[in-house]
Amino acid sequence: MSTVVARVYIVRHGETDANRQGIVQGQLDTPLNDAGVEQARLTADALEDTPFEVAYSSDLQRARRTAEIILEKHPGVKLETTPALRERYMGDWQGVSIAGRGVPPENAEPTIDFTARSAKWWNEAVLRHAQRKASELQLKLKFAQAQNGHANARNGSAVNGLASAEPHTEPDVELEFEPVHILAVSHGGLIGTLVTNLLRSRKLRAGEGVVIWRCFNASISVVDLYEDGKGVLVSYADTTHLNVVDMVQENADVARG
């Protein structure tokens, strides 16, 4: 059975006034409102015991501040902000009410470019850490086999960036190994686009009972990446940690034209 080498927690930023008012934000740099700050704190409580090693966020303040609040409980973890995790640029729609919209404006970021941007970040950031941990796992296995003389312990892999496609048997040696835990704080449109693209390209499969639907403010999605290069969407847009009943139901930044 393949081993999890990376666990990714993808969080949408907390609520903003524009979210509440149904205004398209796109790449406008809007702050969290009071409800958004509280949502971020509840998310921080939910993730307090998660041993994060790496943290990324969009450089827009609503995502960055959400990440900073979460990381207050993880003081040793450095936050890396990046424009790659920004929401889709919505052109003339930015700052406009969701009501009465039609086809996205011509100066909006093309869907193909938006999808490629999110995929590029995933490949260069997340998979890099997964590859590193897969290599670490293989070294530990080889060392354990050499130390204990288990010639028939499972054969490693590091293919597709992660592990080799050769089948292997379960090791009969115990290893001290923990996957890398990664935090990524972004926006509803980007999270939905990233996850949908990974599923369609079969880089991920949805876990049992997992449904892709609205990505609520401060929701948590979890992805497990295995040493064989495969991934599982463990949960999507989970809000069970939030005690805020009156959540914004519609994301104005997700184009439906």
Predicted feature descriptions by range:
Residues S2-A6, G91-S97, Q147-V180, T196-G257:
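Acidic, low-complexity terminal tails and accessory targeting/binding regions
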Residues E15-D29:
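Glycine-rich N-terminal loop/short-helix segment of MobA-like nucleotidyltransferase
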Residues G26-L42:
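Short catalytic helix/loop segments, enriched in acidic residues and glycine
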Residues R41-A108, E124:
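Phosphate-coordination/substrate-recognition cap region in phosphate-metabolizing enzymes
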